[in-house]
Amino acid sequence: MRRRPFVAGLVPALLAPRSRAAVAPERAAASAPAAKIAGAASSTSVADDAMPRGVTHRALRFPADHGAHPDTHVEWWYVTGWLSGGGGGGEVDARTAPEFGFQVTFFRTRTGLAETSASRFAARQLVFAHVALIDLAAGAKDGGGSLHDQRAAREGFGFVQVPAASGTQVVQLRDWSMRREPTADASRLHIAVRSDRFALALDLAGTQGVLLQGDAGYSQKGPDPRQASHYYSEPQLAVRGRVERAGAPARAVTGRAWLDHEWSNEYLGAEALGWDWVGFNLLDGAALMAFRLRYADGSASWAGGSYRSAAGVLTTFAATEVRFEPQRRWTSPRTQAAYPVEWILTTPAGRWRVVALHDDQELDSRGSTGSIYWEGVSALRREDGGTVGYGYLELTGYAGRLRL
């Protein structure tokens, strides 16, 4: 499934004139409308019938579907991963234990407003970005290892959509960017983010093919056929680059990452509160994804997932075949939200323990998408405690119902 431009309440905020002096620094920065999405799969620069519109049972087409789909309500490009020191020229070792976890996410939402306006200021599309870095050693010592930042912008002033056939796809919000290079054999992405307290400059290289989630990229999110998305993943991305923290020298790092790209017109059912999601790169080269949408009483309204073995054999999970069982909760001292940070996860591919590598990985994004959620680097372990992979756990709807 995945991700999540939790945008309720943000449209009026971005439409209204605001004094930069009247908001916090990160919110003032967010108001600058300088967003760009290049490589759109459907845009005003291509014919209306160039791509199927909306979410339908269709074959995904690449490289076009790496780009934006502005005819849909919500869309995200979501990269999470783990890093460790050692940026030499050798092969990236997927078995090295994490020193850092990182998240870089770009969201796009179609507001449904000013659709016929010719004004460059019309907020037809909004773009948001979240970035986070967790230093596991620093976090274990003093709780100060978790850093994050956010931005938001409305369409206009450099928000550009160009045909995917032009080659390179770019998702950019001012100087934060995720750029995909066209290559014949595998994905190659470049991420550049600089915040006041940290910076990331990462190169990601595909080691496997695209993983189409659900029914060949059509992912059901509920019993209503309208509750669906187009969804694909790129697991086992080899990462190489640099991490900087304020007051510390830059570190050369390598690691592994997971990319999700998903777009939808309707996600949550009326009674759903939020969701739980995991994406793990296993040490043997396999990939595991599982999710459940959740009612207020904690029961699942829908679920799904997939497991692709190191040999490339794909198993897709039915809604009734995935079970999340919370084992331990951490309560945020800031919001009092209680997040399950350890789980027993049962799927047709196996039964595992999901364990957060640091409890405090709560993200307050009320300055952009209006939500508070938990997103953190975690380990996937056998029931006997042996680690079989690393990845990310995402928990939404614990600090209040999520509204898309």
Regions found by a protein language model. Give the residues of each.
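N-terminal export signals
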Residues: 5-27
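Structured soluble/peripheral alpha/beta segments that form catalytic or ligand/cofactor-binding pockets
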Residues: 22-404
